[in-house]
Amino acid sequence: SALEEVTSEDLLPKAYINNEPVDFLNSTDCLMINEDHDASTTGYGYPTMTLLVAVNVAEQTIENSVCYLESTNGVYVSQESIYFIQQEGWGDNSKSFIHKFDLDADLAYTGSGEVQGHLTGRGQLDFRINEHNGYVRVVTSQWTGDNEDARDHRLTVLQQSSDSYNLEQVSVLPNSANPAEIRKPNEALYGVRFFGNKLYL
């Protein structure tokens, strides 16, 4: 059949500069979750192809490209990095995976981390993650199933490991030393903003 003759290269996006085709992406450039990793997702979600492409505007050339073949529920871009957010599960089993890439010319993948809950926010998901002084700060929400207190909110701080492809948890609120919940009982978060070393909810 026609599908049997289709190769992975046939499915890749095409790019053109001044109406001329450019060979800028190989299937070997595409990254996927390592299913054997302890922090890997357990479901398939809604797989999509997300491309990172470095374009030299002055020279009108494509310097590099990376292909990411997993669900992408949100994107956050800092001055030095770009983060893809991948959410899984629901209720008290919900979690979010955060995948980090450098924004230099090689677009290198540098690591992934996991936090409890989702970065939900009625269209404001990307405001719930922030990079500051080498730390990644994330606000997540999680449904509890309790009608009297239906939501738990968390602030998690991650940091790039110096010797592995991991975004490691540095701290989280609430915790055993600071157990107070982040909001009033049964209260939803409608806005999240990071400014320097302060967080406004």
Each language-model region and where it sits:
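Beta-sheet-rich non-transmembrane sensory/scaffold domains
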Residues: 1-201
